[in-house]
Design a protein with these regions (language model features):
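Conserved pre-ATP/AMP-binding loop-to-beta segment of ANL
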Residues: 4-8, 19-24, 127-145, 152, ...
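Conserved AMP-binding/adenylate-forming
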Residues: 34, 49-89, 390
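Conserved AMP-binding A3 loop
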Residues: 35-39, 141-168
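AMP-binding/adenylate-forming catalytic core of the ANL superfamily
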Residues: 60, 106, 335, 340-341, ...
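Conserved AMP-binding/adenylation subdomain of ANL enzymes
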Residues: 164-181, 189-225, 240-241
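Gly/Ser/Thr-rich phosphate-binding loop
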Residues: 225-229, 238-298, 310
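Conserved beta-loop-beta connector loops within the AMP-binding
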Residues: 310-332, 351, 369-370, 431-433, ...
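AMP-binding/adenylate-forming core of the ANL superfamily
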Residues: 323-339, 358, 364-366
């Protein structure tokens, strides 16, 4: 979209002049029983902007409420960076986020029983029609805290330019337009729920429905055209065929934030007639890969680079790996959506890039000759080096999930004096461990079979449904 047009404005749909001219949507945002028209959004968010314009940064307790929507929109209209804080975060982690970010106030809601920062409430019925100048595209929009494997969460600094670019790139790939109704029940403090779901809707101008929690029945009742969910939610959707079939009128079903198991992909496609769209990204890069609305959707693969994105695979020594659909390498990307760095951590920022400016994703992947990407998993836990072979945990997990006695599966590598690492699988289900070992050996190369299978009641996951594999290693 051309600079200087309305698209140069980050939240392009919140245009006071257009609303004053009669361009309005009565249900632009719906959260539970609450509804905000576009006129409500513009007037109330601009009123918020007037109250926070002098701040350097504000923290927003990211509950799925109209107050949160108006707080985030108002701060961005004023050009004030937003620090979204999970409502269920522990006191120590919250204190780190506030101290590290330099947030000067809670905007909107604040945690109960805390007086760590001044509080600026959001007035739902206040209105202002002042037109703020659009901040520079390089100005910071968001500081999103992402948990690493060691140390406290790091603040990922995202510019307005990066956020706008990613939404526009996805709009092209997904044929996302103002005619869509986007539905999700995801947290508003991560890329998936906040940047894509909420800010994407406020930029594109489509209707946005947040279901409060990602309950399948709520998804079915929303009657959207574009749905966002994590694999855990899609797994629950396919467990209720009536709910799944209610989504058959949707245009796109998008899965992300973790790998979508192939059996869930297949069942969702069967019940809805819609093979789901998978995409890949990170807080540091936003979304960089996706299958397309008009392209192939292949189970287990996350698609092609979005417009403007370049990817490559390298080995342990930094040499290029073949894009042959089989060779596993370390995934690196270059993208216009790249973050501006980790807040207050220049050394960690420098370490995230190689000498040529490629961002090290930390993920192992395979790239096919057609450019399609398959994510094997995190280098640290999903790339297993066993007996001289490099084995992707995801490939084994896919096979295990194809066994009728397995509901969930996670594969890790653990230190082994003979093999370097031995493959261990954790499964939820009623299959016998020895039968699963033989099942994998029959489907894949023998060296990819688990040396041990443990049947457990559940697998550890975070709020976004991602497996916490380092916890599994600790179980051994």
């Amino acid at each position: 979209m051309a600079a200087g047009s309305v698209a140069a404005v980050l939240l392009a749909s919140l245009n006071p002049a257009a609303v004053a001219g009669g361009v309005d949507i009565g249900d632009a945002v719906r959260i539970g029983d609450a509804t905000l028209s576009r006129s409500d959004l513009v007037g109330a968010a601009t009123s918020v902007a007037e109250r926070v314009a002098a701040a350097d940064r504000v923290a927003v307790l990211a509950t799925p409420t109209p107050v949160t929507v108006l707080a985030i929109a108002g701060a961005l209209i004023a050009g004030v960076p937003v620090v979204p804080v999970p409502a269920d975060v522990g006191a120590a982690e919250r204190a780190h986020m506030l101290d590290d970010s330099g947030a000067q106030a809670w905007l909107g809601e604040k945690p109960q029983g805390t007086d760590d920062l001044p509080h600026i409430p959001v007035r739902l019925h206040a209105r202002s029609w002042h037109r703020y100048p659009e901040p520079h595209p390089d100005a910071t929009a968001l500081i999103i805290y992402t948990s690493g494997t060691t140390g406290p969460p790091k603040g990922v600094v995202l510019s307005r330019r990066a956020v706008a670019a990613d939404i526009d790139m996805l709009a092209e790939a997904w044929q996302w337009t103002p005619d869509d109704t986007l539905v999700h029940g995801l947290p508003l403090y991560h890329v998936h729920g906040l940047v894509l779901g909420l800010l994407g809707s406020l930029r594109i101008g489509n209707r946005f429905v947040h279901t409060g929690k990602p309950k399948p029945a709520e998804y079915a009742a929303a009657r959207g055209s574009l749905y966002f969910a994590v694999p855990t939610v899609w797994s629950r959707v396919v467990e209720d065929p009536d709910v799944a079939r209610a989504l058959s009128s949707a245009r796109l079903l998008v899965s992300g934030s973790a790998a979508l198991p192939v059996p869930v992909f297949d069942k969702l496609a069967e019940l809805t007639g819609q093979p789901p769209v998978e995409r890949y990204g990170a807080s540091e890069t936003l979304i960089t890969l996706s299958t397309r609305a008009d392209g192939e959707r292949r189970p287990g693969w996350v698609g092609l680079p979005l417009q403007g994105v370049a990817t490559r695979l390298v080995d342990d020594d930094g040499a290029p790996c073949a894009h042959d659909g089989e060779t596993v390498g370390r995934l690196q990307v270059q993208t216009p959506t790249i973050f501006d760095g980790y807040l207050n951590l220049p050394e960690a920022t420098a370490e995230a890039f190689d000498a040529e400016g490629w961002y090290r994703t930390g993920d192992a992947a395979v790239i096919g000759g057609d450019g399609m990407h398959r994510i094997v998993g995190r280098e640290s836990v999903d790339l297993i080096k066993t007996g001289g072979y490099r084995v992707g945990a995801g490939e084994i997990e896919t096979v295990l999930l194809g066994h009728p006695g397995v509901a969930e599966a996670a594969v890790v590598g653990v230190p082994d004096d003979d093999l370097g690492q031995r493959i261990v699988a954790f499964v939820v289900g009623d299959a016998e461990p020895e039968a699963l070992i033989n099942f994998v050996a029959e489907q894949l190369s023998v060296h990819k079979r688990p040396r041990e299978v443990r049947v457990v009641n559940s697998l550890p996951r975070n709020a976004m449904g991602k497996l916490l594999k380092k916890e599994l290693v600790g179980w051994l």
